[in-house]
From Swiss-Prot:
Stated role: Involved in base excision repair of DNA damaged by oxidation or by mutagenic agents. Acts as a DNA glycosylase that recognizes and removes damaged bases. Has a preference for oxidized purines, such as 7,8-dihydro-8-oxoguanine (8-oxoG). Has AP (apurinic/apyrimidinic) lyase activity and introduces nicks in the DNA strand. Cleaves the DNA backbone by beta-delta elimination to generate a single-strand break at the site of the removed base with both 3'- and 5'-phosphates.
PROSITE patterns xref list: FPG_CAT, ZF_FPG_2
EC number of this enzyme: 3.2.2.23, 4.2.99.18
Zinc finger (FPG-type): 240-274
Protein name: Formamidopyrimidine-DNA glycosylase
Family assignment from sequence similarity: Belongs to the FPG family.
Keywords carried by this UniProt record: DNA damage, DNA repair, DNA-binding, Glycosidase, Hydrolase, Lyase, Metal-binding, Multifunctional enzyme, Zinc, Zinc-finger
SMART domains linked: Fapy_DNA_glyco, H2TH
Binding positions for DNA per the UniProt entry: H93, R112
Length: 276
C-alpha cells in the first residue's frame, strides 16, 4: 500500500499535470469505488465543470481541491493515476476516467479495485469520515516527542502496532515503521509505553528523517507503485530492513529477521534492535 512518501510524490507529480484543468465529464466503470455521494450519477454531475485548483494530501489520502468540492481519494493497495489522451489504450483495470475540456484524461486504474473516492463540499472534508479521525501530520508542528509519549503512555500495544494506527500520527505503514524503528534501535515488539524519553526522542527524529529521505527518492517501488508520471520510486534501494529477510544488516552484518507483529510482516535486526 502506498504510504506517505508515495502519496506525496503522486500529489506533486499529478499537480504539475492537471492543475487548472476543468472536468468536462466523468466515466465510472466500477461504482463501488464511489463512497460519497452514494449515487454515482450525482457524483458525476457534481464534478462536471469543476476546475482542479490544487491537490493536497492528508496522511495517505489525496485531496483534489476543486472550485466547490474536495475529492478525497485513497489508493489502497495498487491504485494509480495517470494523464492520457483519449486515443491512448485503456487498460482493463482503468475504472474511473476524468475527461478534461482540453481533451486530456486523468485515469484511475486499480488492479485490486480497493481504492475509494469521497466527494465533499469544500470545507466539509476534514469533519467527515474518512479524514475526521486522523492524527497529526509527521511534518507538522503538532508532531512532537511529547505527543508520542502521551498517546502511548498507557497502551499495551507493541510500538509497531501503535505507529500503524493512523489516529495518532498519519502516513506511516509497514515499510517506514520498520525502517524508522531500525534506525531508532527499537525492537518492533517493544510495548510502546515502555519506551524511555530518549527512545521516543530518537524515534521521533527517525520517523521524520526516514519519511523526508523517502520523499526525496520518490518513494519505494516494491511492487506496482509509480508516481503520477508513471515513474518508479528509488527508496527501495536504501531500505535497511524491510524486505531484506536473511540478508546482512548494513550496520552489523547480522541476518535480518522477519516476524509478525499485529498481523503484519515485520523486519528487524536482532542485534541492532534487541528484544525486550
Amino acid at each position: 500500500m502506498p504510504e506517505l512518501p508515495e502519496v506525496e510524490t503522486v500529489r506533486r507529480t499529478l499537480l504539475q499535470l492537471v492543475k487548472n484543468k476543468t472536468i468536462a465529464d466523468v466515466d465510472v466503470g466500477w461504482p463501488k469505488m464511489i463512497k460519497e455521494p452514494d449515487d454515482v450519477e450525482r457524483f458525476i454531475q457534481l464534478l462536471k465543470g469543476q476546475t482542479i485548483e490544487d491537490i493536497g494530501r492528508r496522511g495517505k489520502f489525496l485531496l483534489f481541491v476543486l472550485n466547490d468540492y474536495v475529492l478525497v481519494s485513497h489508493l489502497r493497495m495498487e491504485g494509480r493515476y495517470g494523464l492520457y489522451q483519449p486515443t491512448d489504450e485503456k487498460t482493463k483495470h482503468t475504472h474511473v476516467v476524468f475527461s478534461f475540456t482540453d481533451g486530456s484524461e486523468l485515469r484511475y486504474a486499480d488492479v485490486r479495485k480497493f481504492g475509494t473516492m469521497h466527494l465533499f463540499a469544500k470545507g466539509a472534508e476534514h469533519v467527515a469520515m474518512p479524514l475526521a479521525q486522523l492524527g497529526v501530520e509527521p511534518f507538522s508542528e503538532q508532531f512532537t516527542v511529547e505527543l508520542l509519549e502521551q498517546a502511548y503512555a498507557k497502551t499495551t500495544r507493541a510500538i509497531k502496532t501503535a505507529l500503524l494506527d493512523q489516529k495518532t500520527v498519519v502516513g506511516l505503514g509497514n515499510i517506514y515503521v520498520d525502517e524508522a524503528l531500525f534506525h531508532a534501535g527499537i525492537h518492533p515488539e517493544r510495548t510502546a509505553s515502555s519506551l524511555s524519553k530518549e527512545e521516543y526522542h530518537n524515534l521521533h527524529k527517525e520517523i521524520k528523517r526516514t519519511l523526508k529521505e523517502a520523499i526525496e527518492a520518490g518513494g519505494s517501488s516494491i511492487k506496482s507503485y509509480v508516481n503520477g508520471q508513471g515513474e518508479i520510486g528509488m527508496f527501495q534501494q536504501q531500505l535497511h530492513v524491510y524486505g531484506r529477510k536473511q540478508q546482512p544488516c548494513h550496520h552489523c552484518d547480522t541476518a535480518i529477521e522477519k516476524t509478525v507483529v499485529g498481523g503484519r510482516g515485520t523486519h528487524y535486526c536482532p542485534n541492532c534492535q534487541p528484544r525486550p
